């Protein structure tokens, strides 16, 4: 993991298309501004994890449904 220090108003570039700017530091929170093309998905970590869990649950449900249909057609 690359670790960088930035002050308020300073930025980091990721590749050619993404700029991450420290907009404000308020107590124990840092406000970030992200400038990226619209095709790049950006999510808070906890939201991303929740999305992954929901996608896995949906895949499991779809697989279970598929198995149930196969069993019915075999009977």
Curated annotation (Swiss-Prot):
Gene3D superfamilies assigned: Translational regulator CsrA
Superkingdom of this protein's organism: Bacteria
Transcription regulation found in the keyword field: no
Keywords, comma-separated and alphabetical: Bacterial flagellum biogenesis, Cytoplasm, Repressor, RNA-binding, Translation regulation
Listed Pfam families: CsrA
Protein's GO biological process: bacterial-type flagellum organization; mRNA catabolic process; negative regulation of translational initiation; regulation of bacterial-type flagellum assembly; regulation of carbohydrate metabolic process
GO molecular function terms noted in the UniProt entry: mRNA 5'-UTR binding
UniProt GO cellular component terms: cytosol
Summary of subunit composition and partner proteins: Homodimer; the beta-strands of each monomer intercalate to form a hydrophobic core, while the alpha-helices form wings that extend away from the core.
Family: Belongs to the CsrA/RsmA family.
Its biological purpose: A translational regulator that binds mRNA to regulate translation initiation and/or mRNA stability. Usually binds in the 5'-UTR at or near the Shine-Dalgarno sequence preventing ribosome-binding, thus repressing translation. Its main target seems to be the major flagellin gene, while its function is anatagonized by FliW.
Protein name per the record: Translational regulator CsrA
Origin organism lineage: Bacteria, Bacillati, Bacillota, Bacilli, Bacillales
């Amino acid at each position: 993991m690359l670790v960088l220090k930035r002050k308020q108003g300073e930025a980091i570039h990721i590749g050619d298309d993404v700029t991450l700017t420290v907009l404000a530091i308020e107590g124990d929170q840092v406000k970030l501004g992200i400038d990226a093309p619209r095709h790049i998905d950006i999510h808070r970590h906890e939201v991303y994890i929740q999305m992954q869990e929901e996608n896995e649950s949906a895949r499991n449900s779809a697989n279970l449904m598929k198995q149930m249909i196969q069993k019915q057609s075999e009977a």
